[in-house]
Amino acid sequence: MNNSWNQVIYKVWSPIYDRFFNSGLFLQARKQVFNDLSFKQGQKLLFVGVGTGADLELIDRESLDITAIDLSGDMLKKASSKSSNASIQFFQMDAQKLLFKDESYDVIIASLILSVVPEPKECLKEMERVLKNNGKIIIFDKFAPKEKQLPFFKRIVRPVVRIFGTDIGLYFENIFHKYSDTLTVDEDVPIMLDGMYRKIIIRK
């Protein structure tokens, strides 16, 4: 996967994305991620890879200072159309090269983005950089099982799935290890499909 290809494939995905990833099991999973989260009035939130804005619909947007970025202009248009009455700033931006100052945000939401970007370690590095001290990164994504080899079938289909803009063979532990001195995992729980999808909360 690379950014150029991701822009192409998510242009294709944008008209139908919500049918697959903001309904049914995925909608239930997203709600489960946000159900027990609370935000303080005026907090600065950054949605990295906001997509069509599915997560924006699950929070009280009026009391928060929200910025949302995505590499795909087509996905951003979908997100902004859902949030016309809220003061959210939308930017087309590479999640691996965030154009924000250090320690700018209280909370970062990263749903289905680490498994999409070409360099997930760079993405996490950038999120850590722009996160304030004592801030949190909330991750909802699919990862390979901890300390287990990827099942044979997934190893076979992984290259094909990557063509559609995502990676089913990513180990979160491999991404996180480099930043374990500055970040702490507060929560890591299975959310969907026997733990393939997880909710992970990281604190700086």
Task: Annotate the PLM regions.
Residues V107-E119:
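A short SAM/SAH-binding and catalytic strip from SAM-dependent methyltransferases
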Residues M1-K40, A54-L58, K78, K82, ...:
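Conserved class I S-adenosyl-L-methionine
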Residues K44-K97:
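Class I SAM-dependent methyltransferase SAM/SAH-binding core
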Residues K121-N133:
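A short glycine-rich, Lys/Arg-flanked "PGG" loop and its adjoining helix->strand segment in the class I
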Residues Q96-V107:
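A short acidic, Gly/Pro-enriched loop at the edge of an enzyme's catalytic core
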Residues K44, N134-K136:
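Short glycine-centered segments of the SAM/dcSAM-binding site in methyltransferase folds
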Residues S4, F20-S23, I138-M196:
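C-terminal alpha-helical "lid/dimerization" subdomain adjacent to the S-adenosyl-L-methionine
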Residues K199-K204:
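C-terminal lobe and adjacent flexible extensions of AdoMet/dcAdoMet transferase-like proteins
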